[in-house]
């Protein structure tokens, strides 16, 4: 993995040391997983469920994304998704709109950051 990508991810909020421990130091595997994550079908499915207020489906997709973002060490996005999962788990649906907006904003920020490194 290029030093530029490591630097950008660190600035984004990824603890590269801990994350690489999860990937047993395999930077190529991490980069591959990160690339696959960006095209994960859970994002459009979550958006569709949100637009139709299908809370059970939202929970399932958000929970999946919480696990993936956690494993990839994408802490800012993980925190946003985790907050939404918590609200959905406890049926605090009045909080979902604001939390979904935070998730979308954090995902957009991550995509901008990764765009600077040439990852897509």
What does each model-identified segment do?
Residues 1-120:
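Two-component system phosphorelay core
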């Amino acid at each position: 993995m290029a030093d530029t990508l490591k630097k950008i991810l660190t600035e984004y909020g990824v603890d590269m040391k801990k994350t690489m421990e999860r990937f047993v130091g395999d930077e190529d595997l991490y980069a591959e997983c990160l690339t696959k994550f960006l095209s994960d079908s859970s994002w459009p499915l979550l958006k569709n469920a949100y637009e139709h207020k299908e809370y059970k489906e939202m929970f399932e997709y958000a929970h999946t994304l919480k696990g993936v973002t956690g494993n990839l060490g994408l802490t800012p996005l993980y925190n946003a998704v985790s907050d939404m999962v918590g609200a959905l788990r406890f049926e605090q649906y009045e909080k979902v709109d604001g939390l979904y907006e935070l998730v979308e904003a954090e995902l957009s920020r991550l995509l901008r950051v990764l765009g600077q490194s040439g990852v897509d």
